[in-house]
């Protein structure tokens, strides 16, 4: 049986591990902090992930589930060990810088494998396959409580530091085929989200590898309840991160919209999930994409391309595999 190692095990990481356990796979979990209990036995290793990565068994399948601030640090050591990496760490660094290591060792990395970036990239690639040259790509995504409150109207389903990175890292967009770097939180505008009402969208740096797919005009927006960003701008520098602590008892949802258009045709997809008995909506929508790609690495390794690749590089068969896996877990994309 193939062994899988998970580096990091937060809320979403725990969900990913559970999905692999239910398929009967043998997992080791490496985290300096003991994770929540699992439904089946895992080999828990209480160790610094970076230290462990440098000595991991060669050609291991590794899930990089670490926060973005440290997730990049394990990539080179893992690739030096010829690892096959399914990478969810939302880091500022471009993993393509490790291409030479990958070529030399045979290590592989599939990066940004979540909902957005991740599934959103796969949908844009599908749009390009169907429409050809893309005039416009617009991605809007957010994970939020189902109703606003008098505070932040938000709770972080993953590392709060990664959320703050979204709000502070300059956003890269494309205008008339030129990549521009603009302030995050710009182009704020109200939108209607079916079933929830009026919400606010603002620019964030979520295009990442899609910057190179060739669209004429492209942008990614994060979606929050109105008032959230005003509060961030006024109080963010003094906030207590505990204010964003995820409350499992509170109803929440994840919503994703991807629109692509050519000169004369448009395609649009919407995903919406309110979570379930198996996990929160963000854990499900993000973690199921990660888990699907991890299962491909184990059960259909021929679907994982050589080298360092973003989600849009996956072939149609791999894209269909991910969609089927999501559907089997109750997530439909319309």
Locate each region found by the language model.
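Conserved N-terminal Rossmann-fold NAD(P)-binding element of oxidoreductases
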Residues: 4-8
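Hydrophobic/small residue at the entry helix of a nucleotide-binding pocket
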Residues: 12
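Aromatic pocket-lining residues of Rossmann-like dinucleotide-binding sites
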Residues: 20
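NAD(P)-binding Rossmann-fold cofactor-contacting core
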Residues: 25-38
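NAD(P)H-binding glycine-rich loop region in Rossmannoid oxidoreductase-like domains
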Residues: 45-84, 88-97
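Rossmann-fold NAD(P)-binding glycine/threonine-rich loop
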Residues: 89-111
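C-terminal catalytic/substrate-binding lobe primarily of soluble NAD(P)-dependent oxidoreductases
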Residues: 130-334
């Amino acid at each position: 049986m193939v062994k899988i190692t998970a580096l990091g095990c937060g809320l979403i990481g725990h969900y990913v591990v559970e999905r692999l356990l239910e398929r009967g796979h043998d997992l080791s979990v490496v985290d300096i902090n003991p994770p929540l209990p699992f439904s089946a036995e895992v080999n828990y290793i209480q160790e610094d992930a970076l230290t462990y990565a440098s000595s991991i068994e060669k050609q291991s399948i590794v899930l990089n589930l670490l926060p973005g601030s440290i997730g990049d640090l394990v990539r080179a050591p893992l690739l030096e060990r010829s690892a096959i990496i399914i990478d969810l760490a939302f880091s500022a660094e471009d993993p393509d810088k490790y291409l030479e290591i990958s070529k030399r060792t045979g290590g592989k990395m599939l990066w940004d494998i979540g909902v957005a970036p991740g599934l959103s990239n796969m949908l844009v690639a599908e749009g390009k396959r169907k429409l050809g040259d893309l005039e416009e790509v617009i991605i809007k995504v957010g994970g939020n409580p189902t109703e606003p409150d008098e505070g932040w109207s938000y709770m972080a389903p993953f590392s709060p530091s990664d959320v703050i990175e979204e709000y502070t890292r300059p956003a890269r967009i494309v205008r008339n085929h030129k990549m521009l770097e603009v302030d995050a939180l710009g182009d704020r505008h109200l939108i209607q989200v079916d079933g929830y009402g009026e919400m606010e969208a603002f620019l964030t740096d979520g295009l990442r590898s899609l910057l190179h797919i060739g669209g004429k005009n492209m942008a990614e927006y994060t979606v929050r309840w109105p008032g959230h960003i005003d509060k961030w701008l006024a109080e963010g520098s003094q906030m207590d991160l505990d204010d964003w602590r995820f409350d499992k008892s509170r109803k929440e949802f994840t919503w994703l919209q991807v629109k692509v258009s050519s000169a004369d045709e448009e395609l649009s997809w919407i995903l919406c999930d309110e979570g379930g008995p198996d996990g929160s909506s963000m854990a499900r929508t993000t973690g199921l994409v990660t888990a699907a790609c991890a299962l491909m690495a184990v059960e259909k390794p021929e679907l994982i391309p050589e080298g360092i690749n973003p989600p849009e590089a996956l072939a149609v068969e791999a894209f269909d595999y991910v969609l089927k896996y999501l559907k089997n877990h109750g997530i439909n994309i319309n």
